[in-house]
A protein has these predicted regions:
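Extended, highly charged segments
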Residues: 1-350
Length: 350
């Protein structure tokens, strides 16, 4: 599961409200659950706050002080640039699956760019957008990410849905483009919201824009404005689809019309992310940590079993040889005694 730009917008709004009028400092950063980072925040006279960042999923507030991995890898670079820094704000570039965390340090302003797409990335830049460190280096046609280079956002593909204007639909019926594609190309909005909006107003996603009636265009406008109101409201409720103990999908609106999944309403987006994703990632971490120990136990059990088998074989052979020796001491001919035995007789010549 990954968060869309719309859910990230809601999360960042909530995070900023949590730090209003407070002097909050970054106490420490931990790498947890392999590819997640836990930011431990401190404010005088108040309980500690935790922010979880998983580049493959998103960002959320957490109440869990979970087990930490060894202090190796990228977390050391984050600490070097950011420890004891004052947290200023969280920011989202319009329509992007990106969160920018602003800090004030003794060396000047620092920003953490958290990119939640294409496997994710975490980048630290200074006030001049110079990259100080990055989780992953990148070199593609439109931008490069490596220490020392200047950070650039990925090319903007569409306008943020929060900037929607009524006039945007004024000339929509002049194009032959399919309505779902038109919305996706013009606005930064995930496919699941497009499909739900069109289902609610009973417009097939393959319909050509130039076949839409004035009433259908008006209904489309109403639904888009409704989604924007949900985004910008203080209501943190969310709709969740689960697969057992794992969150399969998360949405600011009920997608029960367009999806076969069953969605249940929850009162807190942040709590759902923390209670299910954090705990699930923690279980995965615990399982992974136990694997080497389990493998060692399996190897030890195999070794013990082989040693027991070897001991029993040697014991049986010793008993057999003792019996043969007893019989030989009483017999006149060893040939008759050893006949049929799996014993090799070696004769030595003087």
């Amino acid at each position: 599961m990954e968060l869309s730009s719309i859910e990230i917008f809601k999360i960042i709004s909530a995070l900023n409200k949590e730090i209003e009028s407070d002097s909050i400092y970054l106490n420490n950063i931990y790498q947890v659950m392999n590819d997640s980072y836990l930011f431990k925040l401190h404010q005088v006279g108040k309980p500690k706050k935790y922010i979880m960042v998983n580049p493959k999923i998103g960002i959320w507030a957490s109440k869990y002080d979970i087990d930490k991995d060894e202090s190796i890898g990228y977390v050391t670079a984050l600490r070097k640039n950011l420890l004891r820094a004052k947290l200023i704000k969280f920011e989202q570039p319009p329509g992007e699956r990106i969160c920018i965390i602003h800090f004030e340090t003794k060396k000047g302003l620092r920003k953490i760019i958290c990119e939640f797409f294409r496997g994710g990335n975490i980048i630290v830049i200074d006030e001049n957008n110079k990259i100080l460190s990055c989780l992953k280096k990148l070199k593609v046609r439109h931008r490069e990410i490596f220490p020392g280079s200047i950070y650039k956002f990925p090319p903007l593909k569409a306008t943020s849905i929060e900037n929607f204007q009524k006039d945007d639909l004024k000339n929509i019926n002049e194009t032959e483009l399919e309505i779902a594609k038109w919305i996706g190309r013009n606005y930064s909005i995930s496919k699941k919201y497009i499909e739900e909006i069109l289902k609610k107003i009973e417009i097939e996603k393959e319909r050509k824009c130039n076949t839409l009636s004035d009433e259908e265009i008006e209904n489309l406008e109403t639904e888009i404005i409704g989604l924007i109101k949900i985004m910008k409201s203080d209501d943190m409720s969310v709709w969740i689809a689960r697969d057992g103990e794992i969150i399969d999908d998360i949405s600011l609106m009920n997608l029960g019309i367009s999806k076969e999944k069953t969605y249940h309403k929850s009162e807190s987006l942040m709590s759902e992310l923390d209670n299910y994703i954090t705990l699930n990632l923690s279980r995965v971490q615990t399982t992974n940590k136990q694997k080497p120990l389990k493998n060692k136990i399996i190897e030890l059990e195999k070794s013990i079993k082989l040693q027991e088998e070897a001991y029993n074989n040697n014991k049986n052979k010793a008993i057999e040889l003792r019996n043969i020796a007893t019989e030989l001491s009483k017999a006149n001919s060893y040939i008759e005694i050893l006949k049929g035995k799996n014993i090799e007789i070696i004769k030595y010549r003087n």
